[in-house]
């Protein structure tokens, strides 16, 4: 039987507009996911809707407005471009974007693959280089929840992660080298990954190991002292312990140790988004400067750069063999 192949690329998602209604809807779906917030539903869901969302939505709207572009959210723009460039790489495949939260959803993407395109082989590529139960596993949860509604389903190839993929490592290394050439050699390079609660690591999530794998492989290709590289973790919220060191704490501390020139890259983000453009490029830059830092450069995510599209294409080809 001739293979009719479909590919779904999946990222976390984004509000459709930088207003309270859209942001609240998005955050409600995101923060209701037990993979993300693994505490008692009996306590969390009422607290989420009665207290947390009204306050968080208001604050988040202002943050989104800082990074919003005329064509929409940076994450959506980047993701749609990634899809379009992958279509050029695989003109005979059906390729859709399926966000974990918000639209276009995984549900709609799978429906197209089965009902419209009639694919018999489906590749799911979560756009998270390092596996975590909070991201990659949540995508798999959603895929399974949707796929069980259909009588006839395609063969499914689920790509767990690509933390050690040579093309990905080369792409990240290339971004760092380009920034060094453009902005000069920094005194310190910060590799900031999204943080997760320590409890998730203790319970078996190998996310921290996968981040370390990426860091080690990038440094093996980078002519830069390992003593001048710090791996840290961002986007902490809540009162429970998260993996450390925390990016904002590292960045505030460095100037006090005489480090006044740093560059920051976020290798775990395949597309620039709120966490990179606002939290790192704006918030953490201000933290660094307020504490006496002089030069701060954020190294952009791979987005839909030529090297990234080729990297993603190679990952897909590898799983087609």
UniProtKB/Swiss-Prot annotation:
A single Gene Ontology biological process assigned to it is:
heme biosynthetic process
Q: Which reaction does it catalyse?
A: heme b + 2 H(+) = protoporphyrin IX + Fe(2+)
According to its UniProt record, where is this protein located? Cytoplasm
Q: Which residues bind Fe cation?
A: 194, 275
User: Is Iron included in the keywords of this UniProt record?
Assistant: yes
Q: What highest taxon heads this organism's lineage?
A: Bacteria
Function comment: Catalyzes the ferrous insertion into protoporphyrin IX.
Enumerate the UniProt keywords alphabetically.
Cytoplasm, Heme biosynthesis, Iron, Lyase, Metal-binding, Porphyrin biosynthesis
GO CC aspect terms: cytoplasm
Enzyme Commission number: 4.98.1.1
Q: Write down the species.
A: Wigglesworthia glossinidia brevipalpis
User: Record's family?
Assistant: Belongs to the ferrochelatase family.
Task: Give the metabolic or biological pathway.
Answer: Porphyrin-containing compound metabolism; protoheme biosynthesis; protoheme from protoporphyrin-IX: step 1/1
| Annotated protein name in UniProt | Ferrochelatase
Q: Which GO terms describe its molecular function?
A: ferrochelatase activity; metal ion binding
